[in-house]
Amino acid sequence: MELSEIKRNIDEYRNNLAQIRGSLDFENKETNIQEYEEMMTEPDFWDDQNKAQDVIDKNNALKSVVNGYHELEEEVEDMTATWELLQEELDGDVKSDLEQNVLDFKEKVDQFELQLLLDGPHDANNAILELHPGAGGTESQDWASMLLRMYQRYGEQQGFKVETVDYLPGDEAGVKSVTLLIKGHNAYGYLKAEKGVHRLVRISPFDSSGRRHTSFASCDVIPEFNNDEIEIEINPDDITVDTFRASGAGGQHINKTESAIRITHHPTGIVVNNQNERSQIKNREAAMKMLKAKLYQLKLEEQEREMAEIRGEQKEIGWGSQIRSYVFHPYSMVKDHRTNEETGKVDAVMDGEIGPFIESYLRYTMNQSDN
């Protein structure tokens, strides 16, 4: 790479950062950081722990954006200074390092822009992820368990904490249903890309004739809310609370007492289970939190449907609306039908490497909103 080309790239990066800064409302973010940090020094700050944690999370999110931008800005200035030194005295090793830094910088800007896409009202929240197999018995239940492992691996790779809140094993293999609570900054913002029907095509290990089978599993993702984030009133007469023994993956008993909780909301038919804690009280609190989140999500979806009717739009619902196909046979391919993102590295995807699919979906939704 010639020095003139290096300079063009650096100037382009500087212009990109200037455009990003213009869209960030930078001064307002820095003012908010100052206000949050003043709140954190108040003597009664920890009196309400949920509210305090919410302030800390919001402050950390803002600082991540502001500090991330400053780091990129400083790196551009460092590259400019190195380029100016090379103008005075050409050093092959220094030039080679600068070339690599210029090439690597594009990926850093792309990742920063991706972070900025997660600006939805609940993107920063933890995520509640549910998997349900489609028709097909053992085949689809096994597929649901493969997706479970994929999301567990993805969560670990992202540094998220993944908890199994509810688990109902399949009769022979796999799972009939499973609920994960995925904790971490922007967990919902990323994982909302996974909501929909996932399709598997493979030679079935359960078919002695070695025939090819197609299986489906649905993934539902909603944000976890703090109690003060949403206003959802639940009439005690509208719910039934049942207790049962908790059991985990593989059938092992987590607790021999009836600490697990099932809450049924009769007006909507929504059922939530929680068996993650040893305490029945804590499981009930967590289950009520999940129920409120589901009712809030239902309310949002009803509003979206009303708007779609006004606009004359129709959305497909059901097993025909697959978002992604995972083909193991007769060839290896994972393809997202919304963005056309695809890869032949099926094993890597099943090991949790779904980042490219999530990133392409986030950019796709940004482009859709711009249009």
Swiss-Prot record:
PROSITE patterns linked to this entry: RF_PROK_I
InterPro entries noted in UniProt: PCRF, Pep_chain_release_fac_I, Pep_chain_release_fac_I_sf, PrfB
Post-translational note: Methylated by PrmC. Methylation increases the termination efficiency of RF2.
Transmembrane segments: none
One GO MF term attached to the UniProt entry: translation release factor activity, codon specific
Record keywords, A-Z: Cytoplasm, Methylation, Protein biosynthesis
GO cellular component terms attached to this protein's record: cytoplasm
Signal peptide: none
Main function: Peptide chain release factor 2 directs the termination of translation in response to the peptide chain termination codons UGA and UAA.
Remarks, miscellaneous: The gene for this protein contains a UGA in-frame termination codon after Leu-24; a naturally occurring frameshift enables complete translation of RF-2. This provides a mechanism for the protein to regulate its own production.
Protein name as annotated: Peptide chain release factor 2
Organism: Staphylococcus haemolyticus (strain JCSC1435)
Taxonomic lineage of the native organism: Bacteria, Bacillati, Bacillota, Bacilli, Bacillales
